[in-house]
Amino acid sequence: MLAPRPLDLRAPRDINLWRTPLALSLGAIVLFGVTMIPDVLDKYAIIHIPSWLTMGSIDDARAILSATMGAVATVLALIFSVALLVLSMVATLFGPRLLYRFMQDRVTQRTVGLFMGTFIYIGLCFLVTHEDPESRFVPQISLITSWILVIASFASLVYYSHRIATSIQNPDMIARIARDIYPAVVRSHARTSVEGEGALPDDAAVLARAATGAIVACPTSGYLQHFDHAALVAAARDQSAMIVLRFRPGQFVLRGEPLASIVPASAASVLEKQVDRCVAFGDHRTLVQDSEFGIAQIVEIAIRALSPAVNDTFTGVACVDWLADALLALAENPPLEGNWYDASGVLRVWTPAVRLERLVKLAFDQIRQASTTTPAVLIRQLDAIRRLSARMSPAARMALRDQAEAIRECAAAGAVALDRRDLDAAFERARAELDALAAAA
């Protein structure tokens, strides 16, 4: 039986800035070949192009094409300059790890590609426009098409300018990252990826059973970006085995480290190759199945904003707001356990669980530590704790309580009396909500 083909779980982003422009440039060459067909047929009087579709004499056509090529080339250089300037600003304001969000932007790629394709198309039109008496030729349909491409290119330039102006704003960037976190969880834990469901296993029992299995060593060093759990479940089911992955997406794995255990060991000869096929590594983390990475990105923006060199309290507050939204999305998506079952409810694939309390700690710790002299951010964190507590699990509420206590200690250490009163009031509101929920449980 053929091994199941892994799903395409590549990161939903293309950080190759050249791929789309290259495709559109090749498309422009193909389009030129298509539009030349009626022009050649008209030249040999096989068909007749109406006079209202013509664009004047050969001299007029060459002059128009030459001027248009120069304008398109100038704008293309301007687009590249703006793109490089934006990348420089992003690296400074948000951090170099967020550069890929601008490199992946489809609007930038398509705008560059459209201008490159238009430039190539006009250049080809210019080459075939002959003024020799023996080979006079004006590709009228191609000339009209070139003008359509020019209009489309400049329309895309207007939208590109709008896109750049909005995308470099802090609130827009933070909101987009937060909204990407929930799809990452869905891709990682969606029950549509498995065929059945069983009772949650005891992690210690699973690891004890894995100790009796065969070890699959990691073939390369790098971040575990994603794995195809559906294909692994199918392969393990066919061999009546279980695959225990020792790492979850987002963790760094060293070459030669135990990546997975296969139980029973007799199935290792078949399943080892399947594990290699279905687990992807890379030089960086992605949001494909790594919800922690999205939270870490927002935290990085907040820490940069709260640094003494920037001191942007409003961005720090916005980061706290959107982190609360991200935690809410994670809390409302229950299957955070890394367990995948076959149709009979037999556990086939296990990975370390993503605990919500760990995500709470990740979302609050570093921002709290960077906000010891920024009471507004600490107050907003306490407000977020109060609003989240009713919708969190008991374990996550304990983590929220720990965060509230830590924030109060920060306030006692560094805030002035007036700010300390505001912080104490926010803390009491959060504690009252947590106490009420604990009493009702």
Locate predicted features.
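Interhelical loop segments of eukaryotic multi-pass membrane proteins
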Residues: 48-49
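Alpha-helical membrane-embedding segments
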Residues: 76-92, 99, 125-139, 167-184, ...
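Alpha-helical transmembrane segments and adjacent TM-loop junctions that form the membrane-embedded core
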Residues: 148-154
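Transmembrane alpha-helix detector for multi-pass membrane proteins
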Residues: 24, 28-43, 56-131, 154-161, ...
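Polybasic, low-complexity association/targeting segments
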Residues: 1-41
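Short basic (Lys/Arg) and small-residue
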Residues: 1-12, 159-244, 248-249, 257-265, ...
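Membrane-interface segments at loop-to-transmembrane junctions
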Residues: 7-24, 52-70, 95-115, 134-146, ...
